Amino acid sequence: MSTEAQAGHWQDSWRDGWLLRARAVASPNFGPRPAGGGIDLIVLHSISLPPGQYGGPEIEQLFCNRLDWDAHPYFQGIRGLAVSSHFLIRRDGELVQFVSCDQRAWHAGRSSWRGRDNCNDDSIGIELE
């Protein structure tokens, strides 16, 4: 496939910042990106909820503000946390998208990279289960 064909193929895979190949689960935890900025950073995280447990619904519940804080003792330490990520790649390979790439997900917290603060402003957050 030519480079032009590959580029066209990927352009057809997106709509309003959503990757059509991903399962969309809209998170309320996002905001606008600063005007005039662009995306030039990818932040990779690893996550399991509760820690060391995989494949359950808790990550999606956390990112959508639906986690039962009383379901596991660990959750008391993160009670009230409002976070999200653009993408989650599950251990079985499933790709889930929570926030449009045109928007600012809340994954990096207070952050700095190479002298720039607020990494959420110009990054894509990807969680690896």
Please tell me what each predicted stretch does:
Residues 2-33, 41, 48-129:
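Active-site-adjacent loop/helix surface patches within enzyme catalytic domains
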